[in-house]
Amino acid sequence: MRHRKKGSKFGRTSSHRKAMFKNMSASLINHELIKTTLPKAKELRTIVEPLVTLAKREFKLRNELDVNSNEFKAQSVALRRQAFDFLRNKAAVTKLFEEFGARYAERAGGYTRILKCGYRFGDKAPMAFIELVDRPQVEEAVEVE
């Protein structure tokens, strides 16, 4: 019986699957929008949302404690190390803690959105965009003739 077995295998070894989701998590944090298959997007959501919660905890500590206190520094470093332990990407960890903690401070979960976008041309796999909610909209450049 498959009781209490969380996640899908995606036809990969455990090390390949783990590396794939670490890379996808870092890409989602850096770009805030990625296109992938629908099952991978659903699995990625369960990985990224706890990372954003770590950033929120650090932001909450920043407001409660003195930033120069040893207690804040110790807890902040511990939270960043937890995130780095999974992501292994300094740029992604920095962006996670400096931008997302403040951005999602008032939101109680649900930091990602999955939008279905049809089927892949080669094998008809269902595709989806996964994006971070409340991301800043980039205005497209308008050509002037």
From Swiss-Prot:
GO biological process: translation
Oligomer status and interactors: Part of the 50S ribosomal subunit. Contacts protein L32.
Entry GO MF terms: structural constituent of ribosome
InterPro entries linked: Ribosomal_bL17, Ribosomal_bL17_CS, Ribosomal_bL17_sf
Family that this chain belongs to: Belongs to the bacterial ribosomal protein bL17 family.
Record bears the keyword Nucleotidyltransferase: no
Source domain of life: Bacteria
Pfam families xrefs: Ribosomal_L17
PROSITE patterns tied to this protein: RIBOSOMAL_L17
Keywords: Ribonucleoprotein, Ribosomal protein
GO cellular component: cytosolic large ribosomal subunit
Record bears the keyword Ribonucleoprotein: yes
Gene3D superfamilies for the chain: Ribosomal protein L17
Protein name: Large ribosomal subunit protein bL17
